[in-house]
UniProtKB/Swiss-Prot annotation:
Pfam families on file: Ribosomal_S2
PANTHER family, sorted: 30S RIBOSOMAL PROTEIN S2 PROKARYOTIC AND ORGANELLAR, SMALL RIBOSOMAL SUBUNIT PROTEIN US2M
Name of the protein described by the UniProt record: Small ribosomal subunit protein uS2c
Molecular function in Gene Ontology: structural constituent of ribosome
Homology family: Belongs to the universal ribosomal protein uS2 family.
Cysteine disulfide links: none
Family matches, as InterPro entries: Ribosomal_uS2, Ribosomal_uS2_bac/mit/plastid, Ribosomal_uS2_CS, Ribosomal_uS2_flav_dom_sf
Gene, per the UniProt record: rps2
Species of the source: Nuphar advena (Common spatterdock)
Main location: plastid
Localisation per UniProt entry: Plastid, Chloroplast
Length: 238
């Protein structure tokens, strides 16, 4: 895998608050190698290591995107949801930003069945078929469609398991992470000072609570994915 330059600036990360961890009482000792200091009762992440792992993650997603691989971005807490959706849409990735439904990956056949129902309902709604049903039946289907849109809207075009999963907030998305581990799907995780770096294939030590921090990390990864996709499109067109 070729190493590239991703314009990762320590100053930019500091401005986004990437270095701020959790209180010193709420930490995982396995994060010790990624912590550079304590300040006013808060652990401070070593941004040099953050830059190194973020660069490694960018190399990985660029290489994967240049080979036509598929990505899933997961971040369901309120502070991450909007950034996850906009980043995923920009890079043409799948995403989950409301709730991870247990078994979404490990019980893929059930998820696939739900997606088929979702697609059928969308088609029926677009063709105006729901408006021709009895009010009670139409109301039930509209509620079902709304539910699907909320929880499956970001994966509605998925036809199989993703090749790489990017996870925002390891603790919040623990179920998703465990499913990836079970299936052997590589993960890139933002890990705050209360996380376990050993659970991720590529851990990125960073503040997973600040919107600016989440957005900066996602923007770097998405930029690398977009460049990789451009490379893939160019190779296919030759």
């Amino acid at each position: 895998m070729t190493r590239r330059y991703w314009n990762i600036s320590l100053e930019e990360m500091m401005e986004a608050g990437v270095h701020f961890g959790h209180g010193t009482r709420k930490w995982n000792p396995r994060m010790a190698p990624y912590i550079s200091a304590k300040r006013k009762g808060i652990h401070i992440t070593n941004l040099t290591r953050t830059a190194r792992f973020l660069s490694e993650a960018c190399d990985l997603v660029f290489d994967a995107a240049s080979r036509g691989k598929h990505f899933l971005i997961v971040g369901t807490k309120d502070k991450a949801a909007d950034s996850v959706a906009s980043a995923a849409i920009r890079a043409r990735c799948h995403y989950v930003n409301k709730k991870w439904l247990g078994g979404m990956s490990t019980n893929w056949s059930t998820t696939e069945t739900r997606l088929h129902k979702f697609r059928d309902l969308r088609v029926r709604a677009e063709m105006g078929q729901l408006s021709r049903l009895p009010k009670r039946d139409a109301a039930i289907l509209k509620r079902q469609l709304s539910h699907f849109q909320t929880y499956l809207g970001g994966i509605k075009y998925m036809t199989g398991l993703p090749d790489i999963v990017i996870i925002i907030d390891q603790q919040e998305e623990y179920t998703a992470l465990r499913e990836c581990v079970t299936l052997g799907i590589p993960t890139i995780c933002l890990i705050d000072t209360n996380c376990d770096p050993d659970l991720a294939d590529i851990p990125i030590p960073a503040n997973d609570d600040a919107i600016a921090s989440i957005r900066l990390i996602l923007n770097k990864l998405v930029s690398a994915i977009c460049q990789g996709r451009s490379s893939y499109s160019y190779i296919r067109s030759r």
